[in-house]
Each structure stands twice: as C-alpha cells, then as structure tokens.
Regions:
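Accessory carbohydrate-recognition regions in carbohydrate-active enzymes
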Residues: 1-180
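Single conserved hydrophobic/aromatic residue that forms the stacking wall/gate
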Residues: 178-190
C-alpha cells in the first residue's frame, strides 16, 4: 500500500490568530522577505465587525470581516501595532470608481497556504490570487469580459498615509514615495 507523504508545510494554517485580537494575517509572505501581500478588509463598510476608522485596530485583516478593499503591501503580522498596511491594490470591473467605500466588495472562497492567498470578489466576479518572493509580491486577477481596472490606493491604509507620489521609471519599474502620520521622511519603494 502506498502512503502519501505529508510535508510539514501541509500542517500550516495561515488563518490561526486572524481573529479575536490575534493580529496575524493570512497573506502571502516569504520567510525573512521584504514584502507581504495581505487581504485588506478592515475599512469601508458597516458590514465589517472591526473597522480601523471606527476603533483602534492594528492589523489589515480580521477573519470575521467580509468587505475587501484591496491587497496591502508591506505589513507586519502579529505585532499588535497599527503600522504599515499600505499600498492598496484593488481589481474592479465596470465603470471606474475610486471611492473605497463604494468600490470595495464582499468576497468568498478564501484560501491561504504559506506564500499564497486567494479569494473571489462577488461584486465583480473576479478571482484574486497573490504570492510573495523574498523581494516582491505578485498578483493575478482573473477578470470577466468587459471593462476592468486595477486601482492603486496610496491615500488609505492601516495608518492613513498623509502623502504619496507614484513615478513611472520604466515599463517594468515604478518608484513610490509616501509618508505616514508616524514618519516625517519620504520613503522610496522600487
């Protein structure tokens, strides 16, 4: 009889600690990596139990929430302080709308494993998938036919950034300058 081999990674559940003030998130992250790509579901809807603007909140994700406003990049997991959680990337379809309270979507079919996260945005019929490498994050959005958009929200995030600028360096590189209420200096992300 052949037994399937189990790998240690098969026992990892990224959803542990994502509710009840555990402050962890199920996002895609590479061990010792610079980038973490995390579902951001803590702003923009009265349907959410926990909203970062209604109370002090220290994580970009809460498992019991149901309203998704994008993937944040550069996150801390499990630390309990409301820092980073910025650079929100959100796929949409239909007419362009840039108000996160209106463009956000409920989601279903959430899946997470080490280095991978996906969900299905019910408002737009979009499957979203993200992964991470030691230096970057990658996203794949499966759109239905018709008009579609990928929004980059530089003005909202876990810490409510107070300023940002995006500069296209080349076809494959952008430079982002942003500042948050907690930092006085501008930072560049390539």
């Amino acid at each position: 009889m052949n037994k399937e081999k189990s790998l240690l990674i098969d026992y990892v559940d990224p959803f542990i600690g994502t509710t009840n003030f555990g402050t962890t998130n199920p996002g895609a992250v590479c061990p010792n990596g610079m980038m973490s790509v995390v579902p951001f579901n803590v702003m923009g809807s009265a349907d959410n139990t926990y909203d970062k603007d209604a109370r002090w909140w220290s994580t970009p994700y809460e498992h019991t929430n149901c309203f998704f406003t994008g993937y944040s990049h550069v996150n801390l997991s499990g630390v309990g302080c409301p820092e980073l959680g910025s650079l929100l990337l959100m796929p949409t379809t239909g007419e362009l709308n840039v108000d996160y309270k209106e463009y956000g979507s409920k989601y279903k079919d959430e899946q997470a494993s080490p280095g991978y996260y996906s969900n299905y945005l019910t408002k737009y019929n979009i499957k979203t998938e993200v992964s991470a490498t030691p230096r970057t994050g990658i996203a794949r959005f499966t759109f239905p036919k018709g008009e579609s958009h990928i929004l980059l929200n530089l003005g909202e995030g876990l810490t409510n950034e107070s300023g940002a600028m995006l500069r296209r360096v080349s076809d494959s590189e952008i430079c982002l300058l942003y500042t948050s209420d907690a930092a006085d200096d501008m930072q560049c992300v390539d």
